[in-house]
């Protein structure tokens, strides 16, 4: 026996009628085409079906609310992270902090001049690094990414900044825009090159080493460390400005027409930013949202002056020399396995130059009230709030280089030799 609902589930077969009943007034005569019981004629659905439908309709609404909550949570954590990166406990009084003993200034200047007056030793830095770290240092490593590079297992194994896994097409696109990928010819022609890597340390202020620093063949400056207004202490010659997007100087005054801009690429949008800088294009607003601070809108240099740092140098610095653990997948942040730009630049210098000197390096965390940088009022205590770099391990590494005579410390922030 069929129920009424079941009867409504199918149409009755059409059967022609031989005799038509008289139609009431005002109604159409039924025909073989109207003698069908449609679904719309059936009774309303049962209460059980209606309840299920209401439940299904509520599910998407609940899902949207959950997604919104997660989005707001992530955004809130991101804001707190940005605030933490830019937070410092206090500012130092620069007038009081920058007094330097005149005798100390004279000794520092004399020592720096002695370093320059000695005969340059070809391949000294590479040879010394190879002896000190053996198989952990490669003497054949190229400093910059080449247009037709040798196959590198390390480069394809790691994500930025240690390699270019999944970014090979972006790298090739950038290299097509860059006509040169090595040191300029006038520097390559030198039989023996002296490098100085100038850090941002407050110890530089007052030493008046600017004139001496300008005499090095290759002067490497880091991030946005300024020259304008500080040339007496840090010089005004720049051969290489090495930085990542957020660290690049915002002022055109910090760029000279013959500088090399060496880009260190950490994340996907860094590739977009560098391409925009080379092509003199405006970076889209949505791309800017992925940087943790304001980035330069233009770099006033020609394409031939841009270089891309070989990421294997960062890999060599982090995993081989400093022996940090390899990167692990994390939901938020990074392990402390990313070296500072300064230490990466020191290793780069050993691949570029025959002799290497340092100035403006050294974090004395036992003196929290001393100036962190030569150009601002941040105190050394601010280093206690950074979470990306292992300052203790890096300090031991630099001290080892100075003690073994691989590099010279001109400002005495790592180990004073004067």
Swiss-Prot record:
It is a single-pass type II membrane protein. It comes from the Eukaryota. It is an enzyme of class 2 (transferase). Transfers the sialyl group (N-acetyl-alpha-neuraminyl or NeuAc) from CMP-NeuAc to the non-reducing terminal galactose (Gal) of glycosphingolipids forming gangliosides (important molecules involved in the regulation of multiple cellular processes, including cell proliferation and differentiation, apoptosis, embryogenesis, development, and oncogenesis). Residues 1-61 are cytoplasmic. Residues 1-25 are annotated as: Disordered. CDD domains: GT29_ST3GAL5. It is found in: Golgi apparatus membrane. InterPro entries: Glyco_trans_29, Glycosyltransferase_29, GT29-like_sf, Sialyl_trans. Belongs to the glycosyltransferase 29 family. GO terms for molecular function: beta-galactoside (CMP) alpha-2,3-sialyltransferase activity; lactosylceramide alpha-2,3-sialyltransferase activity; sialyltransferase activity. Its EC number is 2.4.3.9. N-glycosylated. The gene is ST3GAL5. One of its GO terms (cellular component) is Golgi membrane. This is Lactosylceramide alpha-2,3-sialyltransferase. The chain crosses the membrane at residues 62-82. Keywords: Disulfide bond, Epilepsy, Glycoprotein, Glycosyltransferase, Golgi apparatus, Intellectual disability, Lipid metabolism, Membrane, Signal-anchor, Transferase, Transmembrane, Transmembrane helix. It is linked to Salt and pepper developmental regression syndrome: A rare autosomal recessive disorder characterized by infantile onset of severe, recurrent and refractory seizures, failure to thrive, psychomotor delay, developmental stagnation, and cortical blindness. Deafness is observed in some patients. Affected individuals have patches of skin hypo- or hyperpigmentation on the trunk, face, and extremities. PANTHER family: LACTOSYLCERAMIDE ALPHA-2,3-SIALYLTRANSFERASE, SIALYLTRANSFERASE. Glycans are attached at residues 86, 236, 390. Disulfide bonds join 195-353. Ubiquitous. High expression in brain, skeletal muscle, placenta, and testis. mRNA widely distributed in human brain, but slightly elevated expression was observed in the cerebral cortex, temporal lobe, and putamen. Pathway: Glycolipid biosynthesis. It catalyses: a beta-D-Gal-(1->4)-beta-D-Glc-(1<->1)-Cer(d18:1(4E)) + CMP-N-acetyl-beta-neuraminate = a ganglioside GM3 (d18:1(4E)) + CMP + H(+).
